[in-house]
């Protein structure tokens, strides 16, 4: 089905509607699973030696030093323009402001007299950030990951990226307080972060995007007892736009294309109650597509994308919630009034002047978001992902005495005798003291 095909939602059967909201299949195979498993085992067993072999095999690079030196990072900084450095500084300031505001106050309550319960937060001690290489270095992801890690108070923050690492990534790492950067990419980088090598330290949690091999490696290490936790499940990028007749077609088209250019497996969807708006957006997409350097990539993504006409805006919201997009853009009159009805989305952009690009780079929200339907259960990345919650309880003699019979009754009902005894022994001790 061509992207230019305008679909009337209410003329479709329930099965057709379901098909319209299906996402492109994620490329997985037994061969990827086996290959990644072998890489993990090899790196775990042979450490740095295995990392160098994989760099030669996959990156066609001879790596003499796995650790990037301070001199290399300083030289990278010198090669960047002041304009780019200033732009990064503005982005970091906004990310800092938004994520600092996410700090949770401690909870400290008396659930009943003499029974004190608290909730406190502690940072994840060590985190590893993975940043892909390629022709378009994702240095903005360094800002999005390293900044909240620093605010959370993570003691160890390290970064891996395939060699040669772009100057922008090295500078962003320095700007955000990353302590060590390593010349290693792919599934082998995930293995190094999960298990540790002579050069790369083992970390508690791994963050960052990657290809099918990186994604599979993260999945596997998160399921190994000696592995590491990961940020969230990964999938192709996506955006859904809700637009009414007052939206600007060129703005809508540019937002759709900014997501489509990410990759051929990206998906973009327009929902509008105005058929004429759908037609005008399709025309604007074609005009803008012709000017894009990544036009072929975007065109492939558009082949699995949709222009859907609905009954009204309420139905747009209903369909959007059913789909649960990574990015949701609402370009309608009084866009904010629709927010309360949104139940599943990674990040929401309201009005004509809130392009997805703002959140991707510099508004302050995080661009690491759940995708592929995971918005039903997962949240956008935030400060909490770099922290742990811990509860504390303290019972006075009086508080314990008042609660003891309740605990004994519940423990006996579950036939957990030792649990009951732990209370009964204390009750008897109090009686002896009386």
UniProtKB/Swiss-Prot annotation:
Keyword entries, A-Z: Amino-acid biosynthesis, Histidine biosynthesis, Metal-binding, NAD, Oxidoreductase, Zinc
InterPro entries: Ald_DH/histidinol_DH, Histidinol_DH_CS, Histidinol_DH_monofunct, Hstdl_DH
Top-level taxon of the source organism: Bacteria
GO terms, molecular function: histidinol dehydrogenase activity; NAD binding; zinc ion binding
Binding, NAD(+): 130, 188, 211
Cofactor(s) recorded in Swiss-Prot or TrEMBL: Zn(2+)
Catalytic reaction list: L-histidinol + 2 NAD(+) + H2O = L-histidine + 2 NADH + 3 H(+)
Self-association state and partner proteins as the record states: Homodimer.
Residues annotated as the enzyme's active site: 326 (proton acceptor), 327 (proton acceptor)
Similarity section: Belongs to the histidinol dehydrogenase family.
Record-level GO BP terms: L-histidine biosynthetic process
Gene Ontology cellular component terms for the protein in this record: cytosol
Keyword Zinc-finger: no
Protein function: Catalyzes the sequential NAD-dependent oxidations of L-histidinol to L-histidinaldehyde and then to L-histidine.
Enzyme class: oxidoreductase
Cofactor: how and how many bound: Binds 1 zinc ion per subunit.
Organism: Shigella dysenteriae serotype 1 (strain Sd197)
Protein name listed in UniProt: Histidinol dehydrogenase
EC number annotated for this UniProt entry: 1.1.1.23
Sequence positions that bind Zn(2+): 259, 262, 360, 419
Binding positions (substrate): 237, 259, 262, 327, 360, 414, 419
Pathway the protein takes part in: Amino-acid biosynthesis; L-histidine biosynthesis; L-histidine from 5-phospho-alpha-D-ribose 1-diphosphate: step 9/9
Gene name per UniProt: hisD
């Amino acid at each position: 089905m061509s992207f230019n095909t305008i679909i009337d939602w209410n003329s479709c059967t329930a099965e057709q509607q379901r098909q319209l909201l299906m996402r492109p299949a994620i490329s997985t195979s037994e061969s990827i699973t086996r290959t990644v498993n072998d890489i993990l085992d090899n790196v775990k067993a042979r450490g740095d030696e295995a990392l160098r072999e994989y760099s030669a095999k996959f990156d066609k690079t001879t790596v003499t030093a796995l650790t990037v030196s301070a001199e290399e990072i300083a030289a990278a900084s010198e090669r960047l323009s002041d304009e780019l450095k200033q732009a990064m500084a503005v982005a970091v300031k906004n990310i800092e402001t938004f994520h600092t505001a996410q700090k949770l106050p401690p909870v400290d309550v008396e659930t009943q007299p003499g029974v004190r319960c608290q909730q406190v937060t502690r940072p994840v001690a060590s985190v590893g950030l993975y940043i892909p290489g390629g022709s378009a270095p994702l240095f903005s992801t360094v800002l999005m990951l390293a900044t909240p890690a620093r605010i959370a108070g993570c003691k160890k923050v390290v970064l891996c990226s395939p060699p040669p690492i772009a100057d922008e990534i090295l500078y962003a790492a320095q700007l955000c307080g990353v302590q060590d950067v390593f010349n290693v990419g792919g599934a082998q980088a995930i293995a190094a972060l999960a298990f540790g090598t002579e050069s790369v330290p083992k970390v508690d949690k791994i963050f960052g995007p990657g290809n099918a091999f990186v994604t599979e490696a993260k999945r596997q290490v998160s399921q190994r007892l000696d592995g590491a936790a990961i940020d969230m499940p990964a999938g192709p990028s996506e955006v859904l736009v809700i637009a009414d007749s007052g939206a600007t077609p060129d703005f809508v088209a540019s937002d759709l294309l900014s997501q489509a250019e990410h990759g051929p497996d990206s998906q973009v969807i327009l929902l509008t109650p105005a058929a004429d708006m759908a037609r005008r957006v399709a025309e604007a997409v074609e005009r803008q597509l012709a000017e894009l350097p990544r036009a072929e990539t975007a065109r492939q993504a558009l082949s699995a994308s949709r222009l859907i006409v609905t009954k009204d805006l309420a139905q747009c919201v209903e369909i959007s919630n059913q789909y649960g997009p990574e990015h949701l853009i609402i370009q309608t009159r009084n866009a904010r009034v629709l927010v309360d009805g949104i139940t599943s989305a990674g990040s929401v952009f309201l009005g004509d002047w809130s392009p997805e690009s703002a959140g991707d780079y510099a508004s302050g929200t995080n661009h690491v978001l759940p995708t592929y339907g995971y918005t039903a259960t997962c949240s956008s990345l935030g400060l909490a992902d770099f922290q742990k919650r811990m509860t504390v309880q303290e019972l006075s003699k009086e508080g314990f005495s008042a609660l003891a019979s309740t605990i004994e009754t519940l423990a006996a009902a579950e036939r957990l005798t030792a649990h009951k005894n732990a209370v009964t022994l204390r009750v008897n001790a109090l009686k002896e003291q009386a």
